[in-house]
């Protein structure tokens, strides 16, 4: 009877360990996807916005895809008028919470912006956000972005 209990306990602990390892692997995949997507958001040139918009939408799904798509015309106008060029310098990411198919990533992007407003001189800055990641068809995509700069005023 003791042997049976030991085998049963070993099996239970083994399954718990496998679930934990699966969760850790999913968190790491989500973190890597968020870190890969951050420069996509922060690297753009007003002279080549079609490629920028395509890359952003390629990594987007759900609410974020709709929000970005809905505001892209206004964003294009502002970036073009301001002759804005942005480059991501450093990206830091961590997973706040999540499971095997969704996660919240805290993302901090160091960026340098050059524009009419900076008189053509590079100006360093930092952008922080929370990305809601969702695993869709085997890919981690961004479903929601919470950032002061990503807020859209309600009309």
Report each predicted region and the residues it spans.
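Short beta-strand edge/turn micro-motifs at domain boundaries
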Residues: 126-154
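Core segments of small alpha/beta cavity-forming domains
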Residues: 25-85
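A mature extracytoplasmic/lumenal domain signature
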Residues: 72, 107-111, 146
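A short, acidic/glycine-rich surface segment
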Residues: 40, 113-119, 152-153
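Surface-exposed, charged secondary-structure patches
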Residues: 82-117
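Periplasmic/lumenal scaffold domains of single-pass inner-membrane subunits
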Residues: 114-126, 130
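Juxtamembrane and targeting peptides
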Residues: 1-43
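Extracytoplasmic
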Residues: 90, 100-102, 124-128, 137
């Amino acid at each position: 009877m003791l042997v049976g209990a030991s085998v049963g306990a070993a099996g239970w602990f083994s399954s718990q360990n496998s679930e934990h390892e699966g969760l850790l692997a999913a968190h790491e995949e989500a973190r890597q996807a968020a870190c890969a997507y951050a420069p996509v958001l922060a690297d753009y040139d007003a002279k080549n916005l079609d490629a920028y918009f395509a890359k952003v939408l390629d990594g987007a799904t759900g609410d974020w895809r709709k929000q970005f798509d809905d505001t892209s015309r206004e964003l294009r106008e502002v970036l073009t008028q301001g002759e804005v060029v942005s480059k991501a310098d450093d990206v830091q990411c961590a997973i706040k919470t999540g499971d095997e198919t969704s996660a919240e990533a805290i993302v901090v992007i160091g960026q340098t912006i050059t524009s009419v407003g900076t008189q053509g001189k590079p100006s360093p800055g930092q952008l922080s956000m929370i990305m809601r990641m969702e695993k869709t068809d085997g890919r981690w995509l961004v479903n929601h972005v919470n950032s002061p700069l990503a807020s859209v005023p309600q009309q």
